């Protein structure tokens, strides 16, 4: 190749590339190592959707394009994605993605939108476990669960006999953040729900208190899980689910995904795969090597200006993919 292809050529290529084949090519260099990693028990797979906001005003799209991604926690590696039109199609897309993945001995974490019996049954049928946030879309189930973790009720209840608890306190950037996980020890009150929700073994809540100067905010989130484990582990799963939110944020802030003007759905999907791959390899390199600047955008710019630095990142990731 004598020169870098023009934008039109790149655009035409992206329109005809098979996204699945592209993903295989990008991740194939360490596919065998990845397979070994996926055999480890209790690995966490975070699944969430992200809307490509720039597609909202494009005539070619009936609804804004929405990409559902499965992220291997701690490794920041995308295991797969499904592209749909609009967030309203996210629920069936998540089920389709779960159906494609090998989730045996994995813990699938999902937000409240996916607290659905059919989704839970699919996860259990594939020998996986789930940790899913519970919200008002489940009517009386949510109300009954939330009542057990209401502060007024907990103040008069015997916490030691009714709840298993675990607390973490983090200080930094002028704030103190306290997270407390309360796990119900006795689920006798929820017998009817246990029969309806496959594999349900734990009902718990996470109380998050943030103190900045003299201001304090409190937030309580309720969850259901098929994983029969400790309050410490359950709190860890809820915290690590934040990684996929952070991952999507990086795609916007560092790679400008929400500002992309690409019209083709196929091209947007391919670009999403490439962006996620770039974020994964640079993030991994920054975390494990001594670099002057720790931001992803700064290291991306360095890759453009220093070819050897780009080679160093790719070489490191080939040998240390996870």
Place the predicted regions along the sequence by residue.
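Short coil/turn segments at secondary-structure boundaries
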Residues: 26-28, 42-44, 158-163, 248-254, ...
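A short, flexible helix-boundary coil/loop motif
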Residues: 251-322
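Polybasic low-complexity intrinsically disordered regions
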Residues: 33-109, 115-128
């Amino acid at each position: 190749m004598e020169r870098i292809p023009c934008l039109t050529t790149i655009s035409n290529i992206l329109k005809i590339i098979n996204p699945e084949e592209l993903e295989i090519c990008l991740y194939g260099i360490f596919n065998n190592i990845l397979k070994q990693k996926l055999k480890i028990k209790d690995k966490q797979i975070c699944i969430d959707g992200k809307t490509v906001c720039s597609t909202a005003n494009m005539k070619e799209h009936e609804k804004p394009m929405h990409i559902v991604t499965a992220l291997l926690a701690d490794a920041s590696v995308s295991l797969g994605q499904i592209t749909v039109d609009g967030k309203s199609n996210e629920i069936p897309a998540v089920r389709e993605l779960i159906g494609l993945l090998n989730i045996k001995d994995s813990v699938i974490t999902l937000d409240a939108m996916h607290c659905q019996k059919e989704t839970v049954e699919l996860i259990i049928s594939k020998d996986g476990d789930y940790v899913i946030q519970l919200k008002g879309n489940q009517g009386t189930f949510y109300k009954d669960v939330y009542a057990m973790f209401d502060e007024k009720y907990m103040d008069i209840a015997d916490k030691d006999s009714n709840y298993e608890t675990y607390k973490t306190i983090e200080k930094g950037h002028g704030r103190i953040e306290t997270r407390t996980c309360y796990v119900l020890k006795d689920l006798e009150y929820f017998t009817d729900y246990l029969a309806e929700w496959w594999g349900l073994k734990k009902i718990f809540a996470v109380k998050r208190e943030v103190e900045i100067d003299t201001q304090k905010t409190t937030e309580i989130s309720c969850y259901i899980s098929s994983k029969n484990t400790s309050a410490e582990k359950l709190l860890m799963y809820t915290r690590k689910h934040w990684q996929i939110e952070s991952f999507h944020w990086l795609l916007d802030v560092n790679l400008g995904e929400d500002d992309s003007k690409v019209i083709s759905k196929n091209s947007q999907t391919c670009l999403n795969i490439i962006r996620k791959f770039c974020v994964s390899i640079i993030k991994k390199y920054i975390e494990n090597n001594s670099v002057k600047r720790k931001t992803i955008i700064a290291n991306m710019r360095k890759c453009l200006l220093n070819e050897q630095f780009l080679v160093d990142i790719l070489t490191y990731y080939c040998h240390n993919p996870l």
